[in-house]
Amino acid sequence: MNTRIPTAIAAVLLVLAVAANAYDKQLDTHVIHEAYILGQRNDKSTGDFLANYLSQITEPQNDIHIAQIELLTPYAQIVDVSRQKSADGYKEDQAIQDYKTHGNTVKVNVSLMLPSAYPKSAESKEVPTPAPATGPEKSAIRPENFWQNFQFNLKQNGKTIPSRGISNQPIHSTATNTAPAVLTGENVWLEYDVKDVASELTNVEVVTPQGKVIKATFDLKKLR
């Protein structure tokens, strides 16, 4: 019996160690409350937390720019939604209901920005900008489905994880008295089942139409 007790304790410690190095896949009401409050604060602590789930892409790119890649665990999703709706009277009961509705998922967001919306270098600023196109010519420049020419992959240990769904949200400029709103980019969302996403190094790869691979790496052992 004396030899079995240490073995049992070691087994418990091992389970605790694994749990401590794994993102939260299933959230109870206590954890949802914690995430909700962090989002509602919408302060530096909220920003510092969510910064771990975002990768700004600084690698030089031609044409369409992959501006940033975001990976959100179930916990981070609640924080992010609560933050976005902190001024809209978003209630904790709604956060709980939203979690039950959307289930346990890992979400990836890729922001694609058109060249006209991306900051220009000093050299490019010296080149005269062509006059804006109008009519049929304008609509032919960049259709809203341009993002479909890109490939999006979530990989662990070199293996591609199948997505459960993909959606997009166009990004438009703000209309003014002298200029209408125009398409400036696209947010592409991919959804994955937490059962398929392990707590380990995870790569989000975006393949451009020209075959260039842009990658962001997240260590899910260090995320909630």
What are these regions (language model features)?
Residues 22-224:
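Conserved functional micro-motifs across diverse proteins
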